[in-house]
Amino acid sequence: MHGPKATLQDIVLHLEPQNEIPVDLLCHEQLSDSEEENDEIDGVNHQHLPARRAEPQRHTMLCMCCKCEARIKLVVESSADDLRAFQQLFLNTLSFVCPWCASQQ
């Protein structure tokens, strides 16, 4: 750098590869022509096995009280499909009431 401010000519980077050996980035893997897809680990054809139930996961939802509009944090544990069915109830008539409004009734 020459002077108090840097100029573009002062900040020129010369990038060069660290190794001179060229690296082949192509994948030379060949897939088998078998019609059945086998699992790599156990060799079992999973297409004919019954479907496993999805593992439940924890989901956090922020809802509003239908009376005072206070925020309510709801935590459920379910599969993604069951959670989707639960969310469909919100589109109909299902509403939540906060503990304070529930105690006032």
Curated annotation (Swiss-Prot):
* UniProt short sequence motif Nuclear export signal, positions renumbered to this chain: 83-91
GO molecular function terms noted in the UniProt entry:
DNA binding; DNA-binding transcription factor activity; protein domain specific binding; zinc ion binding
Q: Which InterPro entries match?
A: Papilloma_E7
Give the main localization category. Answer: host cell
Q: What are the annotated GO cellular component locations?
A: host cell cytoplasm; host cell nucleus
Q: Which cysteines are joined by disulfide bonds?
A: none
Q: Where is this region: E7 terminal domain?
A: 1-49
ZnF regions (unnamed) run across 65-101
Where in the cell does this protein reside?
A: Host cytoplasm; Host nucleus
Give the keywords, sorted.
Activator, DNA-binding, Early protein, G1/S host cell cycle checkpoint dysregulation by virus, Host cytoplasm, Host nucleus, Host-virus interaction, Inhibition of host innate immune response by virus, Inhibition of host interferon signaling pathway by virus, Interferon antiviral system evasion, Metal-binding, Modulation of host cell cycle by virus, Oncogene, Transcription, Transcription regulation, Viral immunoevasion, Zinc, Zinc-finger
Please quote what the entry notes about the protein's domains.
Answer: The E7 terminal domain is an intrinsically disordered domain, whose flexibility and conformational transitions confer target adaptability to the oncoprotein. It allows adaptation to a variety of protein targets and exposes the PEST degradation sequence that regulates its turnover in the cell.
Task: State what this protein does.
Answer: Plays a role in viral genome replication by driving entry of quiescent cells into the cell cycle. Stimulation of progression from G1 to S phase allows the virus to efficiently use the cellular DNA replicating machinery to achieve viral genome replication. E7 protein has both transforming and trans-activating activities. Induces the disassembly of the E2F1 transcription factor from RB1, with subsequent transcriptional activation of E2F1-regulated S-phase genes. Interferes with host histone deacetylation mediated by HDAC1 and HDAC2, leading to transcription activation.
Name the record gives this protein: Protein E7
